């Protein structure tokens, strides 16, 4: 029997016009948007799905990084997420957003993925303006148009 996340993922794939996408054996589904933004969906349980935006590896050579990340996380928390977290296996910074499955639709999922993408864009720009660059071979700061952002953006 398919989980609610699996059924939603099938409808989402149909809505955006791609073939089939599915969760792997670890209950993750990853894909790229515009070959820049890497998103992972986690079939966490039957109550909610997690949406992760993979931002990149932690820079180890910048002393202001931890303070900027804490400041960013506070701002995201004040605006309802997504939240910054660390994935130890990949040594990467992620943006994480909990997506409740009650009354979920492909449109709502797409909107929340867009929230994560917009938040990734803005996080990159704010960190870039502070002289901090996350190591991410896919996201190029020059491809993001408005580089004069001074505040974090939750996309909602």
Curated annotation (Swiss-Prot):
Keywords: Chaperone, Cytoplasm, Virulence. SUPFAM superfamilies: Type III secretory system chaperone-like (SSF69635). It is found in: Cytoplasm. Signal peptide: none annotated. The keyword Disulfide bond does not apply. Changing residue 126 to E: Abolishes Tir binding. One of its GO terms (biological process) is protein secretion by the type III secretion system. Homodimer. Belongs to the CesT/SycH chaperone family. This is Tir chaperone. The gene is cesT.
């Amino acid at each position: 029997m398919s989980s609610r996340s699996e059924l939603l993922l099938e409808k989402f794939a149909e809505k955006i016009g791609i073939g089939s996408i599915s969760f792997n054996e670890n209950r993750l589904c990853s894909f790229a948007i515009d070959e820049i933004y890497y998103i992972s969906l986690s079939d966490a349980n039957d109550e909610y799905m997690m949406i992760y935006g993979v931002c990149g590896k932690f820079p180890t050579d910048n002393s202001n990084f931890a303070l900027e990340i804490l400041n960013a996380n506070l701002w995201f928390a004040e605006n309802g997420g997504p939240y910054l977290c660390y994935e130890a296996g990949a040594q990467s910074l992620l943006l994480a957003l909990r997506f409740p499955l009650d009354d979920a639709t492909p449109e709502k999922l797409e909107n929340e993925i867009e929230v994560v993408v917009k938040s990734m864009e803005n996080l990159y720009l704010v960190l870039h303006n502070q002289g901090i660059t996350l190591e991410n071979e896919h996201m190029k700061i020059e491809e993001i148009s408005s580089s004069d952002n001074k505040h974090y953006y939750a996309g909602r």
